[in-house]
Amino acid sequence: MIASTGKTNLLGLTQQEMEKFFDSIGEKRFRAGQVMKWIHHFGVDDFDAMTNVSKALREKLKACAEVRGPEVVSEDISSDGTRKWVVRVESGSCVETVYIPQGKRGTLCVSSQAGCALDCSFCSTGKQGFNSNLTAAEVIGQVWIANKSFGSVPATVDRAITNVVMMGMGEPLLNFDNVIAAMHLMMDDLGYGISKRRVTLSTSGVVPMIDELSKHIDVSLALSLHAPNDALRNQLVPINKKYPLQMLLDSCRRYMSSLGEKRVLTIEYTMLKDINDKVEHAVEMIELLKDTPCKINLIPFNPFPHSGYERPSNNAIRRFQDLLHQAGYNVTVRTTRGEDIDAACGQLVGQVMDRTRRSERYIAVRELSAEAETAPVAATRT
């Protein structure tokens, strides 16, 4: 457990919250913008370094506030440029953040919880159970740490991080308020100024919160599907028993429609040998998604000890992909990145106890992040 200082952590405050904070200490609201730029654009955590802030205000801030991100436990860099950070949060648990570069694009995969309560059968985090929600500061702190690590400050100039995906450890919609606040900071010009099309939230299917999402934010949405029928999905993703497929897809369509633009849902589908990789599964998937504008990301499973699952053959994956292509869907197969630093999916057993095993996580979310700039709407199933 990391000891709390009792001070207000400014790192996770949205612009509105920051303005209220300055009101509360008797200062002008414009100070909020000044301080936010120092924190997020320049990566500053020392009030004395904020040179356009008066000395009196700096002293006041030091007495009642702080800028504190998660503690970096380790940082590793792969031969392919993938980076992985293990960070410790206030609860004492460790979570992971992974950066995947590709050309001019750099995607950061961010965690939202330590542990997970959803108990997906191919996910070791689910077997470990839920530990804690990350605070807004701990969620946005992963972006802050990565940005500082690259030395890409100010954040709006020659940025290394062009896309963020909430696909790390945990179910983002079960930490709704903190994740929403952090995503607002990702997109705010006083934060990281990332386009709404380049911020993606991935969910296993918490239907009420999908319906709530459009009232609070406009970001891209990805659905962890993993099965084309309720019977199989009930086994793989138990939350499906509460929110079955048609209910779930209806909520996703409502959300996408609410955006008022030609946006498509990303479908994530972890491929498990002899479980969900057969021709009949592809046929079911084609029928299931016929009314859902979407692109599909097939994710070959990376086995881990005692998982009970195996990766399908390349032929089985290609056959599945071809069937979906022939039906008119835009389909990609995830490419594994960062294996030499154990940043590839399923490679971190024993290093961090509370880590995700959702097999779609961490790497090769590059396909997702490319949607806005490389996937024309005409190439998607409508």
Swiss-Prot record:
Pfam families: Radical_SAM, RlmN_N. Its EC number is 2.1.1.192. Disulfide bonds join C109-C345. Residues 102-342 form the Radical SAM core domain. GO terms for biological process: rRNA base methylation; tRNA methylation. Gene3D superfamilies: 1.10.150.530, Aldolase class I. It is found in: Cytoplasm. GO terms for cellular component: cytoplasm. InterPro entries: Aldolase_TIM (IPR013785), Methyltransferase_A (IPR040072), RlmN_N (IPR048641), RNA_MTrfase_RlmN (IPR027492), rRNA_lsu_MTrfase_RlmN/Cfr (IPR004383), rSAM (IPR007197). [4Fe-4S] cluster binds at C116, C120, C123. Its cofactor is [4Fe-4S] cluster. The active site is at E96 (proton acceptor), C345 (s-methylcysteine intermediate). Its main location: cytoplasm. Belongs to the radical SAM superfamily. RlmN family. Reaction proceeds by a ping-pong mechanism involving intermediate methylation of a conserved cysteine residue. Specifically methylates position 2 of adenine 2503 in 23S rRNA and position 2 of adenine 37 in tRNAs. m2A2503 modification seems to play a crucial role in the proofreading step occurring at the peptidyl transferase center and thus would serve to optimize ribosomal fidelity. This is Dual-specificity RNA methyltransferase RlmN. The gene is rlmN.
